[in-house]
Amino acid sequence: MPMVHDTEGMVNIGKATQGQGFVHTITGFTPKQKLEEQKDLLVAYNEGEKSAFVGGTVPLNFRHALAQIEVNAKNAKPSSVRVEVVGIKLVNLGTKADLALPSSTTADRVVADPAANTNKTLALDSWTGLQGKDTPATAYYKNKAASDNVLILTDQFQSIMFGADRFMVIPQALTPWDGSTSTTGAYLAVLCRISNKSGDNYSVIYPQPKAADN
């Protein structure tokens, strides 16, 4: 019995295909663009006769189907430069794919010999038909909410996620952006303001101030 689950309950995700009464594939799964609207996706499989399970209860050991990304940053020169972060983006990742659900029992992660347990995670090739790469308009993003403070970077790494949530994206191999004028290749964008610091005085150097700015 393949099962799909998110952190808030059973859900209909994409389009499910069936064979011999079992759901085998979720097609067209697409994570939300806004971080705060994304959900985790868990899958599990078990089978057997009812009489084999104590009290008729079937144990299900769920696996995370998505990749979790947390972004951390620091400022190498906090004494002379101030960096204020107000948003982040993951750009040009694939945004839609099909997931083949497990067809064998997802075993318990807690085993006497963890090295012997090869069934802890879903294989990367469980996801196929990746679409949407190199499309900047569909970037995953998180912006500072009105109630959030601007994040001022220090010389220690800190999360710039504006909360406990993490990006939940389709696992995939990425080709990095090459730093040219090309619009292809994956990259992380940080929306920030950078200022030179002299005592208690600051002068903005990025983005370049306009004449109308005070």
Regions picked out by a protein language model, each given a short descriptive name:
Residues 1-214:
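Extracytoplasmic cysteine-anchoring/structural motifs
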